[in-house]
Amino acid sequence: MELGPEPPHRRRLLFACSPPPASQPVVKALFGASAAGGLSPVTNLTVTMDQLQGLGSDYEQPLEVKNNSNLQRMGSSESTDSGFCLDSPGPLDSKENLENPMRRIHSLPQKLLGCSPALKRSHSDSLDHDIFQLIDPDENKENEAFEFKKPVRPVSRGCLHSHGLQEGKDLFTQRQNSAPARMLSSNERDSSEPGNFIPLFTPQSPVTATLSDEDDGFVDLLDGENLKNEEETPSCMASLWTAPLVMRTTNLDNRCKLFDSPSLCSSSTRSVLKRPERSQEESPPGSTKRRKSMSGASPKESTNPEKAHETLHQSLSLASSPKGTIENILDNDPRDLIGDFSKGYLFHTVAGKHQDLKYISPEIMASVLNGKFANLIKEFVIIDCRYPYEYEGGHIKGAVNLHMEEEVEDFLLKKPIVPTDGKRVIVVFHCEFSSERGPRMCRYVRERDRLGNEYPKLHYPELYVLKGGYKEFFMKCQSYCEPPSYRPMHHEDFKEDLKKFRTKSRTWAGEKSKREMYSRLKKL
């Protein structure tokens, strides 16, 4: 039955429902007299839902629609592409839509054009044709009744890759989740070859609903996730879920560890309690020993002597380097070298009050006086920085009493002692406790020596301070003192001498500071 013409802004949806007898028409109007009597299309669709075939029914029939069908597809909204809830254009836009219709190009894939009679239209018909037309029974002799074709289930990447080459179409343009899972069909037809079906997915048995159910077809999208076909999953993936668990019996000890050497994969594990061998770099060059071969060594190591020889040669290349070039630079601290950085200190030094000075013990002083280092020392000078009355009360054998800095400079720097035959010239300073006067005199000599020579050259590069001074040396080595006695600085009998020498020292110290200032101004 064909409805009369209506205004363009009012769209009508015609459905066909054919009973088993072939004499009845193929297409049956969905909206009857009740729709004209005032019911909306959606209300009428709800009332006549039980008359539709394919939506929630217990049986499915394949649909074949030819490409040359007289149904045409005009400009529609997004809901029209999905097949549900057709919207209506406004009265002002109806004329413009008929004269210059705009078709959405990428809104719906080509394969979904045959999902329903409303979407399967021929582009060759006129544009002003009605939206839906009755299908001629002569053109559909094979189909006495038809149903709306359900949208195709979204295709996975694996299926797209496998079917894309066979069908020759772009399957990536299919709309994802355009309809509920219950509306998806099990077969689809290739539009380029009418009458032939290419099954994308094998038919499944979804949860069927009876005609008495109140299911309107709009099922939750989550239902489709629970009804996935097992055929969509590749066989290799399905075997992971269905195959039984198998325990591997491979011996893990025979496998190579991640950070183990490949040559030691088959060798036995070394004992944890065995002391590790020293590296060849730490041992001296001449005392390098052959490494003991392990009992379980692999045959590759024993049959490949060239590789072992190369590795051994590479190890010896670092050990055979001159000690004077690498080890002296890395191992020697500049504080352990004498003033000109040419060699190390001869005597063993001890910690003292001033960290920038080198201290020796009274025992070292006594050993030098005994001539123990005679073959290494050309001149051994002992500077006694105490006041003259202290020096006369007792001093070390061979010591020179110079309590004024000017006197020390004249004695040492005006006519410096030159070392010969590689022997050293050593100067030792001391006072009563080696706390103030001795260290101050030692610094002064080094300072004046630096000013008189080009860095780092020095006349006296090796200077020492006697730790504990004369008092400690007298208590430990009294036999090396002349006379063997000790007179302190604050002796009651020499208070006047103490004041005189202190005043002289302070006056000379003030004049010294003025002289240094004048000398610096002259250099500027």
From Swiss-Prot:
Enzyme class label: hydrolase
Effect of K514L: Abrogates binding to CCNB1
Region (Disordered): 264-317
Impact after mutating S178A: Increases basal stability and impairs CHEK1-dependent degradation following checkpoint activation. Abrogates 14-3-3 protein binding
GO terms for MF: phosphoprotein phosphatase activity; protein kinase binding; protein tyrosine phosphatase activity; protein-folding chaperone binding
Motif window: Phosphodegron: 74-84
Chain positions found as Phosphoserine: S76, S79, S82, S88, S107, S124, S178, S279, S293, S321, S513, S519
Residue ranges of every copy of the Rhodanese domain listed in the record: 376-482
Skewed-composition ranges (Basic and acidic residues): 303-312
Catalytic activity field: O-phospho-L-tyrosyl-[protein] + H2O = L-tyrosyl-[protein] + phosphate
Domain notes: The phosphodegron motif mediates interaction with specific F-box proteins when phosphorylated. Putative phosphorylation sites at Ser-79 and Ser-82 appear to be essential for this interaction.
PANTHER family named among the record's database cross-references: M-PHASE INDUCER PHOSPHATASE 1 (PTHR10828:SF46), M-PHASE INDUCER PHOSPHATASE DUAL SPECIFICITY PHOSPHATASE CDC25 (PTHR10828)
Similarity field: Belongs to the MPI phosphatase family.
Record-given protein name: M-phase inducer phosphatase 1
Organism per entry: Homo sapiens
Gene: CDC25A
